[in-house]
Amino acid sequence: MVKLKETIQKAIPKHARVPLITVALLHSIFYWIPPLLTGGAYHRDFSIFVDESIPFLPFFIIFYAGAYLQWGFSYVYHSAISRGVCTRLAAADIITKVVAAAFFVLLPTTMVRPALDGGVFDFLVGIIYFFDEPVNLFPSLHCAVSWLCFRSAFSMRRELGGAYAWGQLAFSLLVFASTVFVKQHVFVDIIGGVILAELAWLASSHLPSEAVFGRLEAVFSRNKSNR
């Protein structure tokens, strides 16, 4: 346990811990609470003509599930490298989740999922379907968070290299495609998620996020030292 703690402390520097913990906690709150508030509400289906021509490709569950790895790696890696990017990314993420949660509650959406066959990838899709009901669709947080991974990488392209930043974009585009190919979202959800994340990223540059998280870090450090 001591070695594990030391490894985590090395991977996640002190300045990144409060922002990342805050992001993780708020994600759970803003994603899981809205369905409890809208259980009996009318849910709209935002499917359009484009969605009718999009096939069900269960193989893309690899990229859909891979998004979770992208988020975890990118948020920790980018935050560890730059305090400024860390706090801006956290602020953009929080803005995204707050606005998305408002949509989930005020404009609940749903969609029709396909019947699954017995293949391996269908089985994996079925696991996602079991744990993730067809709600909280617009805007797509899957697409929004992957876009923030790219935007934060692009902001550090001089430090990380252009190839890394464009690699983030390429993987994010595969994540976008996966959301409709595995029928977790409809096309409009992608557009909404990307626009929301981009606006949140732009807005975060005008917020004193570094100072705010710095104060929170000081408060937690003070409380810890007083124990």
Q: Where are the model-predicted features located?
A:
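Aromatic-anchored segments of alpha-helical transmembrane domains
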Residues: S28-W32, K97-F103, A170-V180
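Interfacial helix-loop-helix junctions of multi-pass membrane proteins
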Residues: P114-G118, P134-F138, L174-L202
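Membrane-interface loops
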Residues: L36-F49, S79-A163, A211-R227
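N-terminal transmembrane-helix/juxtamembrane module of multi-pass inner/ER membrane proteins
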Residues: V2-W71, L116, V125
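Short hydrophobic alpha-helices at membrane interfaces in multi-pass membrane enzymes
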Residues: L160-L173
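Hydrophobic transmembrane alpha-helices
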Residues: F150-F154, A197-S205
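Hydrophobic, membrane-inserted alpha-helices
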Residues: Q70-S74, W147-S152, A170-S178
